[in-house]
């Protein structure tokens, strides 16, 4: 198995730029025969997101970016970081989550 770790400079709240960086890295990794590419914590939204995570539009944009990235995870496994809603009744309302994408 060929694994790639993508260390990039993400920008807080700049979903378009962060998503483009991630998609570009995935495309390069595919060309190199990578099986799994790993991105850093909160790569989708930039870190630290601080108070931005309290706004539902911020979280919705995170989910939209994750969905856009999922579409290019057709022949490669992708592990990315983003905040996620806690669907349990207990605990904090958000998690610092890892999303595994593979179509």
What spans do the regions from the language model cover?
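Hydrophobic structural segments
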Residues: 1-103
């Amino acid at each position: 198995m060929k694994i790639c770790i993508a260390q990039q400079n993400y920008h807080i709240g700049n979903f378009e730029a962060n998503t483009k960086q991630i998609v570009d890295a995935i495309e390069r990794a595919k060309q190199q025969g990578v099986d799994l590419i790993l991105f850093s914590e909160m790569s989708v939204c930039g870190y630290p997101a601080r108070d931005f995570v309290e706004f539902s539009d911020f979280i919705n944009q995170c989910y939209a970016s994750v969905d856009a990235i999922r579409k290019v995870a057709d022949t490669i496994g992708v592990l990315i970081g983003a905040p996620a809603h806690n669907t349990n009744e207990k605990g904090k309302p958000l998690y610092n989550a890892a999303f595994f994408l593979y179509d």
